[in-house]
Each structure stands twice: as C-alpha cells, then as structure tokens.
C-alpha cells in the first residue's frame, strides 16, 4: 500500500524506478512540479547544455509504464523553475488512470503551500484514498 510522491527531480527518479523495477505494493504515484526530460530542462536553464545529458533516465521514457497504477500530476502555471508544460507533456504520454491538476497562479512546488494548500490538499487526499480503496 505504497503511495510514491516525487517533487522536481524526484519525479523522474520515481518514473525510472517504476519503469525498470518492482512495482509490487505501489498503489498511487503523485508527481509535483517535475520535468519530462533532463535535456529539455537543462537547455532551459543553460542553453546548449542538454546534449551533455543522458536521456535514458528521463521521465518521458517511463511515464506510460506507470499504468495501471493511478497517476496524479500537479504543477503551478506560474512556475519559473520548471515550466508547467513539462507536466502537461508527461500527462499526454501517460496512460489511464491519470489526472492533472494545474494551479492557475501556482509557483514551484506550491500545491502544499499556505497559499494553495487548502484548495489542493483535499483533492490530493481524495486521490490517495481512491487509489488505496478503489471499490469505494
């Protein structure tokens, strides 16, 4: 009855582990403000640097393998560290069951902040409870 939760670089690490490893007991995956590709995010930070990185660990390579485990992606649309389009791309590559929450004025890893926690915490708890108790 594990729920895996990854923020930022933790997201691709979780996706890589699920794609390559044992998934037994994993009931849900939540990714907050993560990125789809190491090279893409590196190029956004330092133009031209992406070609130096090994893309074999990028989340976009493994996101489809999460299914049938329920997946929740969360991202702030005002994130200036990792653009929200990364979560949108991961969502488009993922298989059902999946859910995407975009926080209109949310910044980087802002879903649990004082500013947004009350709004999104309930949705996240509902997602977890639904994943742990799929009969309800």
Q: What feature does the model see in each segment?
A:
Residues 130-136:
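Alpha/beta-hydrolase-fold serine-hydrolase catalytic core, especially in secreted/extracellular enzymes
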């Amino acid at each position: 009855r594990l729920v895996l939760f990854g923020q930022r670089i933790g997201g691709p690490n979780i996706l890589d582990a699920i794609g390559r490893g044992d998934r037994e007991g994993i009931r849900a995956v939540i990714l907050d403000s993560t990125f789809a590709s190491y090279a893409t995010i590196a190029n956004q930070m330092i133009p031209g640097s992406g070609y130096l990185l090994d893309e074999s660990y990028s989340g976009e390579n493994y996101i489809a393998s999460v299914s049938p485990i329920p997946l929740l992606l969360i991202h702030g649309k005002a994130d200036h560290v990792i653009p929200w389009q990364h979560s949108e791309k991961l969502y488009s590559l993922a298989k059902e069951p999946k859910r995407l929450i975009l926080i209109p004025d949310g910044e980087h890893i802002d879903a649990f902040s004082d500013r947004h926690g009350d709004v999104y915490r309930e949705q996240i708890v509902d997602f977890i409870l639904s994943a742990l108790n799929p009969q309800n």
